[in-house]
């Protein structure tokens, strides 16, 4: 194990020695200039770990119940689909990725990665109220997930 680049990683590692979080959710923006399909939608990146994709789909059903309408079932990228092909799936098992690393730390917890657009969802320009509404949707989905699991 090498020296961590970011202080946040040390803090998370210290936390996992005391607490056992039930979930890791990596939320970040997709690359700019990629295909519109991926650049302007909210989606989960399908994981290859045994049972992970089924868990992600279950979480997706909870998030899709949100009121913002920003996340839609069917927008997720399944393992093996498009750019999430064999090279990406191999990388998902890599402990240098957030989800790969988390599975080495707490393999029994739920892990997922979300790509969210920078400013536009489909043809809609997003503003502060949209982001707050999406945050409420995510919070409600997490709560429902934790209650159920």
Give names to the regions the model predicted.
Residues 1-73, 77-96, 103, 113-115:
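Active-site/substrate-binding loop(s) of hydrolase catalytic cores
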Residues 111-125:
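Short helix/strand-capping connector loops at secondary-structure junctions
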Residues 102-108:
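Short glycine/proline-enriched loop/turn "hinge" motifs that connect secondary-structure elements
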């Amino acid at each position: 194990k090498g020296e961590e680049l970011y202080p946040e990683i040390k803090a998370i590692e210290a936390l996992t020695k005391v607490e056992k979080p039930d979930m890791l959710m990596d939320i970040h923006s997709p690359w700019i200039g990629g295909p519109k399909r991926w650049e302007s939608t909210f989606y989960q990146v399908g994981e290859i770990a045994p049972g992970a994709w089924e868990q992600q789909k279950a979480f997706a059903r909870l998030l899709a119940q949100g009121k913002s309408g920003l996340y839609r079932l069917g927008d997720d990228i399944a393992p093996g689909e498009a750019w999430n092909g064999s090279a990406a799936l191999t990388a998902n098992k890599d402990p240098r990725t957030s989800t790969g690393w988390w599975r080495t730390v707490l393999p029994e917890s739920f892990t997922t990665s979300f790509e969210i657009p920078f400013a536009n969802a489909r043809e809609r320009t997003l503003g502060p109220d949209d982001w707050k509404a999406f945050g409420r949707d995510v919070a409600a989905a997490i709560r429902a997930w934790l209650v159920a699991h």
